Swiss-Prot record:
Matches recorded under InterPro entries: DUF3719 (IPR022194), FAM149 (IPR039630)
Region (Disordered): 392-490, 551-575, 609-644
Gene name, Swiss-Prot/TrEMBL: fam149b1
Family: Belongs to the FAM149 family.
Pfam family, one: DUF3719
GO biological process per UniProt: cilium assembly; protein localization to cilium
Organism listed in the record: Danio rerio
Cysteine disulfide partners in this protein: none
Name of the molecule in the record: Protein FAM149B1
Bias kind Basic and acidic residues: ranges: 395-404
């Protein structure tokens, strides 16, 4: 197979693949064949060379199988570069892909084969005792290495196969020559793994040991010293840990101190005695130390303090312990003697004179408080208790007058009555004492006489309302509510005429109802003439047609409630009592919202069963018929007057 090839001209100004022209001059490229016969003969020669190399590698692998002794080498021992057997090949490296670079590949591979062969010969000389090398100097050098470094001569069979790429097994001869005769005499087989070393020189025994005549008669033959022969090198290692005892003691002391800080102090008797002894010793040493440095402190003080400052900053402490002269001046408390009037005047004059001479600087810190603080006794003033009581009583009376003259501010509830609230619950808000009376707790005192300044004009109830109190089902079934005011006095039993005397002293009560058209205002003023028509209208609304729709329902909201005037505060003129007439005395008001049949039936249970206004029954019916308004429920009675 002949291939034609035409050479391309290459510029000599360029470098070929990083190689300079000097390299090309030293290693010229091979000449191209003129004809095809020369080229074919070269290909045939390369093929024959490859076949010979392959046959040699087969023989070496067969011998390695027979011997069983394997060693490591690389694949480069078999030059498998038959792929590059012509100048048309591209080579192994991708960098040398030019058609002219095949010569450089040949040179590199030839050099690498030579170096690899030299390394293999060195390994065989050192480890396998082979002498097949042709280099005399290399053989002598390897013998010298083997003599100086015996640990390199380790013979044996490799058990673990190599895992690295590029390595293979090859056979070694069964009998390997050894350089020394002593080694050959003891060597039986090379398949065993052992380490060769130098023989130890044994010491000869002394004359007393070898001569049996010198031995004592009582000794046996077993007591003779014997030397055990052994081969190998003996090395002795002496390890000594040098620790300083002082450092160790110091470490223990520091660790003890740390442990003592972390935990509670010891409370054992031994520790307590130890601490007490240490405290006493410290006190003695401290006293001696203070006594030694006392003179130095005084000299230092005298040297730095001026004469002016000595008079001002004079230390005059009184020592509580005269037998102990080693107390520091700063620890001794100064005692101030009692001062008289003459001494006080002298001190004030001296202080005024010395204020201009007080130094400003570090010496001011040494000032003491002697002659600067004056303490005098002040006689106690006895208080007049009778005068204070009178003042308190007068203040209380004034506050009561203010409360009584106020137009019903403490009696009227703040908000509107809630729906679905019973009649007793709606009127119970009037029985609560005012906030000011609940907060303060006045001491018990006697009743004050009625004076002209406290009296008020008395207005009888005949001018306002004439009638009899009507009972309700709640009055018959339930007990009267308890009064929340503490100091209200109960009225005497059987007094019916006294009710009209103090009735004009109470405040006016105004109860606002929900809705603008269903309001009921009941007020008591000194002008009874202006309120008579309004009261007559209230009385007329009571005898209207009964409401039978919500008569027996307990949850019916009461749109109107009592507007009552309490009449209990008989023992205290000038003090308005808060509450409803729960004792059944006098007239407190008339219900505007209850018009049921049960309420009308309650009139028969009164002992005085006459109606106060009998001639106004017919106009009442007419007025109630005109005043009734029809809403959704059809059961709410509203007043036709816009002002109510």
């Amino acid at each position: 197979m002949i291939s034609r090839y035409s050479r391309r001209p290459v510029s000599h100004n360029l470098e070929i693949r990083g190689l300079s022209r000097s390299c090309l001059d030293q290693h010229p490229l091979p000449e191209e064949a003129d004809n095809g016969t020369a080229h074919s003969s070269r290909l045939l020669h390369n093929l024959q060379e490859d076949m010979s190399l392959y046959s040699r590698s087969e023989e070496s692998s067969a011998s390695s199988v027979r011997s069983g002794c394997q060693t490591l080498t690389t694949d480069d021992t078999v030059p498998s570069w038959s792929g590059i057997h012509s100048y048309t090949g591209t080579g192994i490296s991708t960098e040398r892909s030019s058609v002219f670079s095949w010569g450089y590949d040949e040179f590199d591979k030839a050099a690498s084969r030579q170096v690899q062969q030299m390394f293999e010969e060195i390994d065989e000389l050192l480890y396998e005792r082979k002498c097949e090398t042709q280099l005399k100097g290399l053989q002598d050098e390897c013998q010298e290495w083997a003599f100086r470094f015996p640990h390199l001569r380790i013979l044996g069979t490799q058990v673990v196969c190599p895992t690295d790429e590029g390595f293979q097994w090859y056979a070694t001869p069964a009998q390997t020559p050894s350089p020394s005769s002593s080694f050959q005499s003891k060597e039986n087989t090379v398949s065993e793994l052992y380490v060769q070393g130098r023989r130890a020189v044994l010491c000869r025994p002394t004359v007393e040991v070898t001569n049996p005549s010198i031995r004592t008669s009582g000794n046996n033959e077993d007591e003779l010293p014997s030397v055990i022969e052994a081969e190998g090198l003996i090395e002795e290692y002496l390890a000594y840990d040098c620790r300083d005892m002082d450092e160790e003691c110091e470490r223990e002391y520091v660790s003890r101190r740390r442990r003592r800080r972390r935990c509670l102090p010891p409370v054992s008797p031994y520790r307590c005695r130890q601490e007490a002894v240490l405290d006493m010793l410290f006190d003695d040493v401290w006293r001696e130390l203070i006594g030694w440095i006392e003179e130095l402190v005084r000299k230092h003080w005298d040297g730095y303090v001026l004469d002016d400052e000595k008079s001002t900053v004079a230390l005059s402490p009184k020592c509580p312990d005269p037998q102990n002269p080693f107390m520091l001046p700063s620890n001794v408390s100064t005692v101030l003697p009692p001062l008289s009037q003459t001494r006080t005047q002298q001190l004030t004059t001296n202080l005024q004179a010395q204020t201009s001479r007080v130094p400003v600087g570090p010496a001011v810190a040494h000032h003491n408080l002697n002659d600067l603080i004056m303490i005098h006794g002040i006689p106690l003033q006895q208080r007049n208790l009778g005068t204070l009581d009178r003042l308190n009583q007068s203040d209380c009376r004034d506050s009561e007058d203010k409360v009584s003259h106020r137009p019903g501010s403490s009696v009227i509830p703040a908000g509107k009555p809630r729906p679905r609230r019973a009649l007793d619950q709606s009127t119970s808000s009037l029985t609560r004492p005012p906030q000011s009376a609940r907060r303060r707790n006045p001491p018990p005192r006697n009743l004050m006489p009625i004076t002209s300044s406290v009296t008020q004009p008395i207005t009888t109830m005949e001018e306002v309302v004439r009638g009899t109190r009507l009972t309700t089902p709640s009055d018959r079934l339930t007990s009267p509510p308890m009064h929340l005011s503490r100091n209200t006095l109960l009225p005497p039993i059987g007094t019916g005429d006294i009710d009209h005397v103090y009735s004009g002293q109470h405040t006016r009560l105004i109860q606002k109802q929900r809705g603008s058209s269903s309001r009921a205002h009941s007020a008591v003023t000194d002008e009874g003439i202006s309120l008579q028509p309004r009261d007559k209208l209230h009385l007329l609304d009571v005898f209207s047609r009964p409401n039978t729709t919500h008569t027996f329902r307990s949850d019916t909201p009461y749109h109107r409630s009592f507007t009552g005037i309490d009449n209990i505060g008989q023992g205290r003129p000038g003090r308005a009592s808060v509450g409803v007439d729960s004792l059944g005395i006098g007239v407190t008001g008339i219900s505007l919202g209850i018009s049921s049949s049960s309420f009308i039936d309650s009139f028969s249970h009164r002992p005085m069963g006459h109606f106060p206004i009998g001639h106004e029954e017919e106009p009442d019916a007419k007025a109630s018929g005109q005043a009734r308004s029809h809403n959704r429920g059809g059961s709410t009675a509203r007043s036709s007057r816009p002002g109510l």
